[in-house]
Amino acid sequence: MRKNILDFSYEELVDEFSKIGLEKFRVDQVWDWIYKKHEFDFDKMTNLSKEHRNTLSERFYIYVPELLDMQISQIDKTTKFLWKLEDDNTIESVLLFHPDRVTACISTQVGCPAKCAFCATGQSGFVRNLSAGEIVSQIIAMEKHRKVNIGNIVYMGMGEPLLNYKEVVKSVKMLNHKKGKNISMRRISISTVGIPEKIVELAQDLPEVKLAISLHAPNNYKRDIIVPMNKKYSVEEIIQSAKEYQKITKNRVTFEYILIREFNDFVDDAEKLAELLKGMGAYVNLIPVNPVPSSGELKFERPHHWAIERFKEVLDKHNIENEIRREKGTDIDAACGQLRRRYITNKK
């Protein structure tokens, strides 16, 4: 049975090639075609002999996701992609354009088991984990379609990265490899809802990668309501693991905080958050919620402008470095899960 060559790390591919009589430098050539020239057809890899191309075609194939939909913001060029995988499941990726860099936001699972109440992805349910190749292929597919060079990566798309730990770590190492994309570990961020034991493991396995924790509430009572996994991993456990992560890596931790009108945007919430993060040197991203349909009593509405500023002022007063995230792609379905959810709904 032929295998998708993108699912192999560099080291694994060297081993696979040696089994079929191909030298190590042939891996360099193939990776150069795939990762730098975005060529996914062995027959067009002209610095390989016809015999070698035939050998590769007999044992491997190159599968990158099929583009189903692409939305480009007229405001800031933010680009949202909807991809179809080999098994017809769908995932999303996003390109974010900055004056000095292009950042890719990529998915790690089809759907998400975390089921955060404010997230369109979580409301669609969980299907399966992505392979390392499916994670990495989002990067090269986006580069090919938008003709850009991606320099920063955030694992903040569909899915909980730390619940697909092995494949996520493998994909990071593949993207960092000097023969592949050669993206610095320090330009890669992994966002998690908070899996304490995996946060500590990540510190040991990928100490240079940046960590972002989706906290969203300063206490267990409120977090239980919007982040169901908090019933398993409490705020206190998450903060403790973040401190252990800092101790091991010496990296600053970013905390994501979704602001929801008249739920977690009060002065008292800001005071409790400041107390929780006291002495950590943490960074807080304040994110006004993207409205999503809700079947419960809680309405996911953006806070008033003055409430957002009031929350920020409290953190400033306590010397907690923070910023209000500037929205990108407001004229397209740029929030996580929106494009896929609409596609699934229209198919029914």
Swiss-Prot record:
Which positions bind S-adenosyl-L-methionine? 159-160, 191, 214-216, 290
| Cofactor(s), names only, from the UniProt record | [4Fe-4S] cluster
Statement: the UniProt record of this protein carries the keyword Disulfide bond = yes
Q: What SMART domains does the record tag this protein with? A: Elp3
Signal peptide positions on this chain: none
Q: Which Pfam families match?
A: Radical_SAM (PF04055), RlmN_N (PF21016)
Q: Would you tell me the Gene Ontology cellular component terms?
A: cytoplasm
Provide the E.C. number(s) assigned to this enzyme: 2.1.1.192
Disulfide-bonded cysteine pairs: these are 105-336
Q: Which residues bind [4Fe-4S] cluster?
A: 112, 116, 119
Keywords attached to this entry? 4Fe-4S, Cytoplasm, Disulfide bond, Iron, Iron-sulfur, Metal-binding, Methyltransferase, rRNA processing, S-adenosyl-L-methionine, Transferase, tRNA processing
Question: How are cofactors bound according to the entry's free-text note?
Answer: Binds 1 [4Fe-4S] cluster. The cluster is coordinated with 3 cysteines and an exchangeable S-adenosyl-L-methionine.
Q: Which reaction does it catalyse?
A: adenosine(2503) in 23S rRNA + 2 reduced [2Fe-2S]-[ferredoxin] + 2 S-adenosyl-L-methionine = 2-methyladenosine(2503) in 23S rRNA + 5'-deoxyadenosine + L-methionine + 2 oxidized [2Fe-2S]-[ferredoxin] + S-adenosyl-L-homocysteine; adenosine(37) in tRNA + 2 reduced [2Fe-2S]-[ferredoxin] + 2 S-adenosyl-L-methionine = 2-methyladenosine(37) in tRNA + 5'-deoxyadenosine + L-methionine + 2 oxidized [2Fe-2S]-[ferredoxin] + S-adenosyl-L-homocysteine
Residues in Radical SAM core domain copies: 98-331
The protein's job, in short, is: Specifically methylates position 2 of adenine 2503 in 23S rRNA and position 2 of adenine 37 in tRNAs.
Q: Which family does it belong to?
A: Belongs to the radical SAM superfamily. RlmN family.
Miscellaneous comment in the UniProt entry for this protein: Reaction proceeds by a ping-pong mechanism involving intermediate methylation of a conserved cysteine residue.
From the Swiss-Prot or TrEMBL record, give the protein name.
Probable dual-specificity RNA methyltransferase RlmN
- Native source species: Fervidobacterium nodosum (strain ATCC 35602 / DSM 5306 / Rt17-B1)
